[in-house]
Amino acid sequence: MALFHNPEERPYKLPDLCRTLDTTLHDVTIDCVYCRRQLQRTEVYEFAFGDLNVVYRDGVPLAACQSCIKFYAKIRELRYYSESVYATTLETITNTKLYDLSIRCMCCLKPLSPAEKLRHLNSKRRFHKIAGNFTGQCRHCWTSKREDRRRTRQETQV
C-alpha cells in the first residue's frame, strides 16, 4: 500500500483512493484501523457504499471492518447518547425537512435513504442523538434486529 505523507494529497473516500492507486474496489487491499485485519471483499464494498472516510496512520490508509464498525457504533451509543425524538420533532428542532438532514444508521453508520427516513416517520420510530448527531436505523439493521428479537422470544417461551 502506498504511503501518503502529505495530508493535502490524501484521498478520504475509498473510491478516490482506488483512483489514486490506479486500482478498483474489487482489487484494493486495505486493513482495519481497529483490529488491523485485512478487510474482506464484501467489507470493502460496504465501507465504500457506507460513505465512510479513510483514515491515515503514519501515512498508511486504513478503513474499518464491519464487526469493528458495529462494535464501536455500540460503544459510541452507550457513551454519547443524549436524547430521542420523533421525526416531526426533529424537523421542528432543526428547522430542516427530514429528507434534507444527514442521518446515519446507529448500528452500521451508513447514511439513511429517504425511504428509510420515511419508514421511521410512518412507524413512529424515534431518531436518537448520539455524539451530537441524529441517527436512526437502516433497512438492513432494522430487519435484522427484529429477527434477533423474535429468535430471543421464541427461545424463552416454554
UniProtKB/Swiss-Prot annotation:
GO terms for biological process: DNA-templated transcription; regulation of DNA-templated transcription; symbiont-mediated perturbation of host apoptosis; symbiont-mediated perturbation of host ubiquitin-like protein modification; symbiont-mediated suppression of host innate immune response; symbiont-mediated suppression of host type I interferon-mediated signaling pathway. Disulfide bonds: none annotated. Keywords: Activator, DNA-binding, Early protein, Host cytoplasm, Host nucleus, Host-virus interaction, Inhibition of host innate immune response by virus, Metal-binding, Modulation of host cell apoptosis by virus, Transcription, Transcription regulation, Viral immunoevasion, Zinc, Zinc-finger. Its main location: host cell. A zinc finger (unnamed) spans 32-68, 105-141. InterPro entries: E6, E6_sf. GO terms for molecular function: DNA binding; zinc ion binding. It is found in: Host cytoplasm; Host nucleus. A motif (PDZ-binding domain) lies at residues 156-158. Gene3D superfamilies: E6 early regulatory protein (3.30.240.40). GO terms for cellular component: host cell cytoplasm; host cell nucleus. Pfam families: E6 (PF00518). Forms homodimers. Interacts with ubiquitin-protein ligase UBE3A/E6-AP; this interaction stimulates UBE3A ubiquitin activity. Interacts with host BAK1. Belongs to the papillomaviridae E6 protein family. Plays a major role in the induction and maintenance of cellular transformation. E6 associates with host UBE3A/E6-AP ubiquitin-protein ligase and modulates its activity. Protects host keratinocytes from apoptosis by mediating the degradation of host BAK1. May also inhibit host immune response. This is Protein E6.
